[in-house]
């Protein structure tokens, strides 16, 4: 591992670790970790603060994934390192040192990584995940479905090994991060899209 690659990995992790949801909520006098699901992500911001702040958070979180991959490319690193930098950004988002190694579930940041690695795969996953979300009215269901779609497509499409490994890892991590949502979906207690924090 070269010093450049090590620096890129570290910076990617730190970029991903920027807790946009928590900091934006704090600026509005809300501790996002103590309201709603306690998750530091766009969905909890939507329920706690509304559409505008949620859109800002989602956009920033997507950008984190994109920037990590672009950083690796700008430093002249190979495609393998670019994919790994994307993965590190998602890990940083999910386990941020700024939030005692807690964070979000990595949906938006994973989408940013996948979209920049493979725009067609990213767009296809996004459209189908959004469709699932609107049909079921569950953000978590759309996110989980998106993970399965991305994982399935990357296995059947001719993709480089490193891109395939990165997407499969991110898909598995996303499903794992939603394990509590899966239990709530099974129990019928998961909040639907549009429900506010009580």
Swiss-Prot record:
GO terms for biological process: phospholipid biosynthetic process. It catalyses: an acyl phosphate + sn-glycerol 3-phosphate = a 1-acyl-sn-glycero-3-phosphate + phosphate. The chain crosses the membrane at residues 5-25, 52-72, 81-101, 111-131, 138-158. GO terms for cellular component: plasma membrane. Its EC number is 2.3.1.275. Pfam families: G3P_acyltransf. This is Glycerol-3-phosphate acyltransferase 1.
